[in-house]
Amino acid sequence: CTCGKKGCLETEVSGMAIEEKICDLIRSGVNTILREKYDRNEPIHINDIITAARNDDNLSIELIEEAGEKVGKAVAFLINTFNPETVIVGGNLAAAGDYIMLPLKSATNKYSLNLVYKDTKFRLSKMSDNANAWGVAMLMRNRIIGL
């Protein structure tokens, strides 16, 4: 993580963290369909890992599901605290679809209060990684035109 701290969610489940984990595991001898790419010294990106998961690569599936569970624990805390109507999952990992959402929902169900969790809806963002930039642009537009 760019903050320099250890153990924050960014160091555990970001695309970059998952990319580093898979490279470490490949170096240690774990089998994956991404080994050839690694052996050619080509960078492995999160989109490669998601594609590998869709092609039934066990290691890629495992890493994405692990990330989903960790995010789910954090989301459970937020649900318990803020009781949101909807949780929207975005970013690179949103492209993993059910590979990220099923373990995320499972962990959220396990670690949140049922009274609060039962009415919470989950959605995958259809926006790209530029969602933050779009949000800032909309805020500025609204401020300029006085909304």
Which role does the model predict for each range below?
Residues 5-147:
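ATP-binding/phosphotransfer module of carbohydrate and carboxylate kinases, centering on a glycine-rich
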Residues 1:
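Short cysteine-rich clusters marking metal-coordination/redox-active sites
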